[in-house]
Regions:
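Short, acidic loop-to-helix structural element flanking the phosphoryl-transfer center
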Residues: 2-11, 88-116, 122, 126, ...
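Active-site neighborhood of HAD-like aspartate-dependent phosphohydrolases
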Residues: 2-51
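Helix-loop "lid/cap" segments that line or gate small-molecule binding pockets
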Residues: 37-38, 57-72, 128, 160-161
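Substrate-recognition "cap/lid" segment bordering the active-site pocket of phosphatases
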Residues: 93-95, 115, 121-179
């Protein structure tokens, strides 16, 4: 009799993981980063900001801050400030989601290649993976900086599958939000 994991992996050629909210418990960090950033720029934080940003690539989030919230900083400056605010938390504070390490180990035992597909920056994604000592599981790491169209557009997943050398239809994807 097959267990739940074996059933999920049956017929799959690869597994693709989101990072924030899926492998690591970091979503609260981003609410705090946004609050500090908006305060520094004299802007209020709407109650539904996190919902509106859900699934956007980091560059799309910068566009949202420029075009909707009205912050004039260039996207590169926004990204640098967001990275600065989040970096130490990613290095020292953020923990793995319960069960994530077990899943990675089980998938590795099945010898299925794994990839990351995250909306985050490469610097923060790699910091998180390194801090949790899990970067070695992944053959491919796709970030929001690698794509023009962020999630929920399927391109980041399709490109991760292509780089793994598998058909996207034969991949299992772990995400924490429908927009992802």
């Amino acid at each position: 009799m097959k267990n739940d994991i074996e059933r999920l992996l049956e017929g799959k050629e690869a597994v693709i993981f989101d990072v924030d909210g899926t492998l690591i418990d970091s979503m609260g960090v981003w609410e705090e980063v946004d609050r500090i950033y908006l305060t520094r720029h004299g802007k209020p934080m709407s109650e539904d900001l996190q919902r509106k940003l859900a699934g956007l690539s980091i560059l799309q989030a910068a566009d949202y801050f420029r075009n909707v919230i009205g912050i004039d900083d260039p996207p590169e400056k926004m990204l640098a400030e967001w990275n600065e605010l989040a970096f130490e938390q990613y290095r020292h504070e953020i923990q793995m989601k319960p069960g994530a390490a077990k899943w990675l180990s089980l998938i590795e035992e099945k010898e299925l290649p794994m990839a990351v597909a995250t909306s985050n920056t490469r610097k923060l994604a790699m910091t998180a993976l390194h801090a949790q000592d899990i970067e070695h599981y992944f053959r491919v790491i796709m970030t929001g900086e690698d794509v023009v169209r962020g999630k929920p557009d399927p391109f980041v997943y399709q490109e991760a599958a292509r780089r793994l050398g598998v058909n996207p239809k034969n991949c299992l994807v772990f995400e924490d939000i429908p927009e992802g």
